[in-house]
């Protein structure tokens, strides 16, 4: 396991709220339910370090405790389309295929109703 602290923020603006979780261990290790947290926010900016297992050839990815985007989408799959649209995947490793917005993986993410953040994204609060 990594020896680091994981921090997330709930940001409250005058009109909207944002959940900001740029780096977290697996969702099962968090004492809160990520789907509930997304529903309670206007925006959810969520850790997308890795898209799926096997992204780092030769590395045991179970030793790198970020939730895969595929795991996050599975955890949020029961949310309505309206709630899934609140999710913005952020903090992508250079190996993450979501960095290529034309990749098959990016198409899957968007087809399921989620968003992929890009440089310069601004969300009004």
Task: Give the location of each predicted region.
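Cap/insert and terminal regions of metallo-dependent hydrolase folds
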Residues: 6, 15-17, 24-121
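A short catalytic or substrate-binding loop motif that flags glycine-/basic-rich loops and adjacent residues
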Residues: 1-4
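Generic detection of short hydrophobic beta-strand segments and adjacent strand-loop junctions
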Residues: 123-125
């Amino acid at each position: 396991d990594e020896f680091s602290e994981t921090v997330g923020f709930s940001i409250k603006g005058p009109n909207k709220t944002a959940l900001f979780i740029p780096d977290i261990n697996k969702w099962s290790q968090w004492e809160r339910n990520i789907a509930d947290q997304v529903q309670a926010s206007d925006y959810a900016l969520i850790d997308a370090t890795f898209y799926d297992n096997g992204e780092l050839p030769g590395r045991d990815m179970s030793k790198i405790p970020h939730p895969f985007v595929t795991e996050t989408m599975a955890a949020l799959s029961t949310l309505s389309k309206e709630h899934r649209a609140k999710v913005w995947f952020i903090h992508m490793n250079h190996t993450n295929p979501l960095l290529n917005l034309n990749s098959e993986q990016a198409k899957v993410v968007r087809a399921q109703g989620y968003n992929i953040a890009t440089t310069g994204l601004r969300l009004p609060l």
